[in-house]
Each structure stands twice: as C-alpha cells, then as structure tokens.
Amino acid sequence: MDIGTINFNYQSRAVYSAHPQTSRGRLFHEKMNTARTPFQRDRDRIIHSNAFRRLKHKTQVFIADESDHYRTRLTHSIEVSQIARTLARALYLDEDLTEAIALVHDFGHTPFGHAGEEALNEAMMQYGGFDHNAQALRIVTKLEQRYANFDGLNLTWETLEGLVKHNGPLLGPYAKNKEVPSDILQYNAKQDLALDCFAGLEAQCAAIADDIAYNAHDIDDGLRSQFLTLDQFEHVPLTAAILKEITDEHPQLDQARCGYTLVRRQITTMIEDVLKQSHENLARIKPTSINDIYQAKQTIVTFSPSMTVYEKELKNFLFENLYYHEQILSRRNAAKCIVQKLFNCYYENPDTMPESWCQKAVHLKNQELARLIADFLSGMSDHYALREYHRLFDHTNHFV
C-alpha cells in the first residue's frame, strides 16, 4: 500500500494546527505506518506503556486504597483527554496529538500525589531536584524499554514538545522564573524542542483541560468523601451560579445527583468559556501557520478574564477547604514520610531495592545513584510504595 493513499485528512484541520504529514519526526527514524498517522501511533504507544498502566494506582488527593471511586492518575488522564479532544475538535486541531499529550502529561508523577513529589524533590535537592515534567520526559525517552532499536517510546517531536512545554515556554522572555531541569536540557541538546517558544495549540488544549478536569473532579471527590458539602459551594461565585440554576430547575433533587450535575455543568461552562476566548484570541492574532502559534507572545487557548478570576477563587476555596483539610494534611504528612524514608533506605542500602534495580545501582554513587532511586521511587504506585514501606520498616497502615 502506498503511504500516500492514507487519508490523513480524516478530520478538518485549521492552517495553524499540527499535521501528521508535516511532523518534525522522531529522534530515531521509523518507516511510516500504513494504517495510522504518527500521532495515532504516539497515542497508542502511550496507552500500551507500563507507565500508563501504573497510573491506575497513583492518586492526586486521596490515597488509592481509600475508596474504589476516588479518581486516580489514570482516570484523571482519561478525563483530561476527553475534555482536550472536545476543545481540539471545536478548534479544528489534530485530535490524536491532543489526546496523546493529554494521556502522557501525568507520567512523571510520584505515588501519593503532590505530597510524594514534594518529598522526593526535597530528598533530591542536592542532586538536582525532582520535577514531574522532566521525569515524564525521562520515561518516554529512556526508561520505557520495549523496542529493539531504541530506549523510550520514540514519540514524535510534536508530542514531546507538547509534553515539556504545555504550560508555556521554558526559556526566553516568556518563560516562568523557574530553572529548567537538567534532563530536559540534556534531551533538548539531542532534539531541539524550541524551549523558548510556546507549544502548539494541541498541547495548550491538554493543559487547560487538565485545569478544568482537576477542579471539577476534586469537587466530586470532595463531596464523595464528605470533606465538602454543597452548602459551601453557595459561597463560591462560579459554583453558586450553577447551583442556583440546578435548584431552580430541580428543587427536589437529592444531594448526590445535585453534586454530579454541578460537576457536569461546571465542566461544560468552562469548556464553552475557553472556546469563546480562544476563538477571540485567534481572530485577533490571525495565525496562518503553526509557526505563528509557536512564535505568538501569549498562550492562545485560555479562559476569559472573568473565568480566570472565577477559577482562581475556586482553587482558593479547594485549597482552604479540601487540600488543607486536617485529615488530608495528616495523610499528606504520612505519605511524605514514607517517600523520604524509602529514598534514604535505598540510598544508604541500594541492595534493598529489587534485584533488577540493584544491578543497575552497582558502581553508582552520589547523583547517579540518587537519580536511579528517583526513577524507581517515582514509578511506584501508591500500593507498591506502601508494600515496600511495610517490607522495609513495619506493617502499620499509616493512613488509618
């Protein structure tokens, strides 16, 4: 079959979207596939990876063994990809690339959510620190070892640059004041990811979809856990307006269904706001190619100014009432202790790691050993980290 006969135009694309036929390719050259575009192959490689499966037992706020219904990194990533594809379709972007970036964006996260990352970053501080985006890049370019001709997944340039820069440029005048992790700089020396430019719109869709999903679904989990009540949301401008609509339409609706309806309508409201604002941004900038997106002096897929305020107020509310809840903080502290003690144990006694990792640790010292341990630790699920802690230290459930 002639590769030229593949229908790469199965969906309408804007002139400023990514296109598989003009992809900048992969670090290691591969023949084109006769059935799938390069971005479809990226998505499929991500889904079939070990790192993707491990997301099933990694959490964000609630620990994985607390309930079967709280969200994990896996369910969150799927929900982000669904929202991101909705945005991409409405903006005439490449949906497969958008989905790939959305599905891979959490690969580098540690067990126990942000508490685990804070603990690992503190343990790694004298060895270069730990950053989940840099770790995700390590995973897809080095640590996943499934192919005969290369380490990593050998993803396209567009997926990698979207992974690394979905929150904005890392270098140059529009970068946030944050040191670029060495792993990103080292890879960038091999394959230039244009770290001083904005990411493509597909990555921007994945980034804002992450925000939309995170806020809405933490409300859902907060209500499910009973750490939050619907009454509290009557004092948050965005949710108060939605709740009023719901109660006006369904005055007898029970609390559970009201909560689910709140979450659904909040997602819809935010998506509609992003699309309206993004269309306005595009109309003003008038990009004629994807390079105009890379060289833009701003993020294009954004909330409106008013929604930005509402979203910040909602985040503040969640921090004060959920993330800083006494029981959540207690579990965060326990999680940090587990990660810190595991790191120290492995660093002082590398032979306590599983055999395959012990072999890698032979002759490694200082920063190289610490980075190996960070690779091992960050790849753990919540369940595996707890098992390791119990094996090495005690049999107490520290989250009871």
UniProtKB/Swiss-Prot annotation:
Q: Which Gene3D superfamilies match?
A: Hypothetical protein af1432 (1.10.3210.10)
Keywords assigned by UniProt? Hydrolase
- InterPro entries according to UniProt: dGTPase (IPR006261), dGTPase-like (IPR050135), dNTPase_2 (IPR023023), HD/PDEase_dom (IPR003607), HD_domain (IPR006674), PHydrolase_assoc_dom (IPR026875)
Listed GO MF terms: dGTPase activity
Residue ranges constituting the HD domain according to the UniProt record:
73-215
Q: What processes does the entry annotate via GO biological process terms?
A: dGTP catabolic process
Family membership: Belongs to the dGTPase family. Type 2 subfamily.
The name on file for this protein is: Deoxyguanosinetriphosphate triphosphohydrolase-like protein
Organism expressing this protein natively: Bartonella tribocorum (strain CIP 105476 / IBS 506)
Taxonomy, top ranks, is: Bacteria, Pseudomonadati, Pseudomonadota, Alphaproteobacteria, Hyphomicrobiales
